[in-house]
């Protein structure tokens, strides 16, 4: 037998087998030549589920979506050259949103590097600081030591991806020709396999009792506190953070991505309309918390971020399992390295029930006044983008997922996704907040989250049209609501809007595309709705039937801006009147 083929087969077979032993059982493969042996072995292994995606940029985000939904590592495989470079945006998003991706790039052997060989470029540390670990794998070799090396390297790599903060890792595989493994070899998957699988077991960081005692002592004298839950708050936090809020009397400002706004849990302490009422100047000047405790990433709301920045005399506690200093407001006074649930449990063990005061009641009252005013838009006949969110939530079934694209959809979700007893998961790409790869991420998530509705603007939809291929290839079920305002709607809300002379060409960027034919090219159904009743019917139909369904609702940027501003202005008047009445 050819010694090279034997080495290639056993060495890479050990690697693929070890991935599955470590519960990395999903791989997104971008077709190519140099990655042939790994791709074939993955397809052959009974423990591996493979997904083909021919566009590497979309493939990267597709894998990201699977990993986000499954909450476990997913592998991503491509050939050498620019194929690997096209994974870069998804790797950046995975790094900043703390999603474990196992990026596998095939490469030319060392003798073909830097000599002008075709499809060869420097892939060493290709993703720079956006991966937690880079490993240049050794060339295949037929020896027990190298089979063991393949498995041990896999174990270390997966451990790195899973340890807090979770994130992407990169393995680069130089491979010589010929590239076809020999599947007739005996015990193809067993080489280097020991009795045990070595992997770092995850556990909670225990909080020092001295710190807990000190914190409890301080909090007991701080009646005006806030609990802020952002994207990435651990699902286990729901019950315990509610108990902490009840004991302290601190309102919970829950970002939609915290998934605390919906479900059958007690939401008495949850505040959902802060993004609107924190725009009120009188409220911002008179409501001064003395402690803020934050879990997860910084919330979507700019109004909340600005409010936090102004609380310069308050104690700001950021809880982060990795201990990383995630504080874009630059006000953190303490960063506590602990899991969200561990921090809450430690407080609950020693925290007395604090004396009731008016603090929580103030927040609850203004929140209810704000929600009541905002809900007036539910009577609008005009195509208002905020109503897109409320009407989708209205028809979504129990257990559904709402994926909000970046730009306006996530902001409208923040403003108009009100608390609900229906269990609806909200997802988004808020690592680096780009508009690229949104369709692909949502499609990846739809493998696990069914039904899933994606809300996306027309520019973001255009940006990732190639991603629709995955729906056809893998027979995925998804409903995509395209809010088509013919351009970048968010810029109408920003200072750039005042530069009328160049606004449309540089920021409004109307592209005037009709998406019906491209959706049908990918085997999907397309409907352009006429009125809100028709909109709700189409969304509901999409969630109940298989396949790709695209529902387009056309809005006018100018009208949408006007309606947002009118609604905010009316809400500000209601809040100011309420605050002035309380002060008399």
From Swiss-Prot:
GO-annotated biological processes: menaquinone biosynthetic process
Classification from the root reads: Bacteria, Bacillati, Bacillota, Bacilli, Bacillales
Reactions this protein catalyses: isochorismate + 2-oxoglutarate + H(+) = 5-enolpyruvoyl-6-hydroxy-2-succinyl-cyclohex-3-ene-1-carboxylate + CO2
**Needed cofactors:** Mg(2+); Mn(2+); thiamine diphosphate
One GO term in the molecular function aspect is: manganese ion binding
Q: What is this protein called?
A: 2-succinyl-5-enolpyruvyl-6-hydroxy-3-cyclohexene-1-carboxylate synthase
Alphabetical UniProt keywords: Magnesium, Manganese, Menaquinone biosynthesis, Metal-binding, Thiamine pyrophosphate, Transferase
Protein source organism = Bacillus mycoides (strain KBAB4) (Bacillus weihenstephanensis)
Documented EC number(s): 2.2.1.9
Q: Is Protease included in the keywords of this UniProt record?
A: no
Similarity section = Belongs to the TPP enzyme family. MenD subfamily.
InterPro entries named among the record's database cross-references: DHS-like_NAD/FAD-binding_dom (IPR029035), MenaQ_synth_MenD (IPR004433), MenD_middle (IPR032264), THDP-binding (IPR029061), Thiamin_PyroP_enz_TPP-bd_dom (IPR012001), TPP_enzyme_TPP-bd (IPR011766)
Q: Which domain of life is it from?
A: Bacteria
Its UniProt pathway annotation is: Quinol/quinone metabolism; 1,4-dihydroxy-2-naphthoate biosynthesis; 1,4-dihydroxy-2-naphthoate from chorismate: step 2/7; Quinol/quinone metabolism; menaquinone biosynthesis
């Amino acid at each position: 037998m050819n010694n090279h083929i034997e080495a290639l087969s056993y060495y890479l077979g050990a690697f693929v087998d070890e991935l599955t032993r470590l519960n990395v059982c999903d791989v997104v493969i971008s077709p190519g030549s140099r990655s042939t042996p790994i791709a074939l072995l993955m397809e052959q292994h009974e423990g591996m589920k493979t997904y083909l995606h021919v566009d590497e940029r979309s493939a990267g985000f597709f894998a990201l979506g699977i990993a986000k939904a499954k909450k476990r590592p997913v592998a991503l495989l491509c050939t050498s050259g620019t194929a690997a470079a096209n994974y870069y945006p998804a790797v950046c998003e995975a790094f900043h949103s703390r999603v474990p991706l196992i990026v596998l790039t095939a490469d030319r052997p060392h003798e073909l590097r830097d000599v002008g060989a075709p499809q060869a470029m420097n892939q060493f540390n290709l993703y720079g600081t956006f991966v937690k670990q880079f490993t240049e794998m050794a060339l295949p070799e037929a020896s027990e030591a190298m089979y063991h090396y393949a498995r041990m390297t896999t174990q270390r790599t997966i451990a790195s991806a899973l340890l807090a903060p979770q994130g992407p890792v990169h393995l680069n595989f130089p491979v010589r020709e010929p590239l076809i493994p020999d599947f007739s070899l005996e015990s193809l998957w067993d080489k280097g396999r020991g009795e045990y699988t070595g992997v770092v077991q995850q556990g909670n960081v225990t909080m020092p009792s001295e710190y807990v005692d000190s914190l409890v002592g301080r909090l007991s004298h701080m009646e005006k506190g806030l609990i802020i839950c952002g994207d990435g708050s651990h699902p286990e936090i729901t019950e315990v953070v509610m108990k902490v809020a009840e004991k302290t009397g601190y309102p919970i400002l829950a970002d939609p991505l915290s998934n605390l706004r919906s479900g059958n849990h007690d939401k008495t302490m949850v505040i959902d309309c802060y993004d609107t009422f924190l725009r009120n100047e009188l409220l911002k000047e008179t409501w001064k918390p003395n402690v803020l405790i934050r879990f997860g990433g910084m919330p979507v709301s700019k109004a909340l971020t600005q409010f936090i920045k102004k609380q310069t005399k308050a104690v700001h506690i950021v809880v982060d399992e990795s201990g990383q200093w995630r504080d874009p407001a630059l006000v953190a006074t303490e960063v506590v390295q602990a899991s969200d649930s561990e921090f809450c449990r430690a407080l609950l063990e020693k925290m007395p029930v604090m004396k009731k005061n008016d603090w929580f009641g103030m927040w609850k009252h203004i929140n209810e006044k704000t929600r009541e005013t905002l809900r007036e838009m539910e009577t609008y006949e005009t195509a208002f983008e905020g109503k897109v969110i409320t009407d989708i939530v209205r028809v979504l079934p129990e257990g559904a997922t709402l994926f909000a694209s970046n730009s306006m959809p996530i902001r409208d979700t923040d403003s108009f996704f009100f608390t609900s007893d229906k269990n609806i998961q909200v997802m988004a790409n808020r690592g680096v907040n780009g508009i690229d790869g949104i369709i692909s991420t949502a499609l990846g998530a739809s493998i696990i989250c069914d039904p899933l509705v994606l809300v996306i603007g027309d520019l973001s939809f255009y940006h990732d049209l190639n991603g629709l291929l995955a729906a056809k290839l893998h027979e995925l079920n998804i409903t995509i609501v395209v809010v088509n305002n013919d351009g970048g709607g968010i810029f109408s809300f920003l200072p750039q809007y005042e530069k009328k002379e160049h606004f449309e060409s540089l920021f409004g960027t109307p592209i005037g595309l009709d998406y019906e034919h491209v959706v049908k090219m990918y085997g999907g159904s397309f409907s352009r709705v006429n009125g809100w009743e028709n909109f709700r019917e189409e969304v509901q139909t999409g969630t109940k039937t298989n396949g790709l369904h695209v529902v387009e609702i056309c809005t006018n940027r100018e009208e949408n801006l006007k309606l947002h501003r009118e609604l905010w202005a009316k809400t500000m008047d209601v809040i100011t009147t309420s605050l002035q009445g309380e002060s008399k």
